[in-house]
């Protein structure tokens, strides 16, 4: 089954992301809602196996699924807006579900806390 990731942030919702998500679900896809990549001019933006499509409308779903969409932007991580960034605070943005502890753990979450708990207060301050 095809997994389609679509942002559920406020801007994506205002641009019609819910309707696009419903259209993908109606086409038999598994829809995962997550955080935005921050490319708001491409919302609603759908990601399928790392490939981006946007901005989409519900009527675009069939062409995305059959590979004929003119709204393909290529690999999202290679898009010029994303590729030139060094994401620190937002390293997980667009890659995880914002409220998912499972996604947080799978992408290295808690590692800083584990490291801190293994050190004394003085060692933490010294770092």
Residue ranges and their predicted role:
Residues 1-127:
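Feature of Fe-S/electron-transfer and energy-metabolism proteins
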């Amino acid at each position: 089954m095809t997994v389609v990731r679509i942002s559920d942030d406020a801007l994506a919702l205002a641009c019609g992301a819910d309707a696009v998500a419903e259209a993908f679900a109606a086409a038999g896809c598994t829809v995962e809602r997550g955080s935005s990549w921050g490319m708001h001019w491409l919302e609603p933006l759908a990601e399928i196996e790392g490939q981006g499509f946007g901005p989409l409308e519900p009527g675009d779903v069939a062409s995305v699924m059959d590979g004929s969409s003119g709204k393909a932007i290529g690999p999202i991580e290679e898009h010029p807006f994303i590729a030139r960034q060094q994401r620190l605070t937002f390293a997980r943005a667009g890659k995880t579900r914002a409220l998912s502890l499972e996604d947080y753990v799978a992408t290295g979450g808690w590692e800083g806390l584990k490291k801190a708990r293994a050190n004394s207060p003085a060692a933490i301050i010294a770092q």
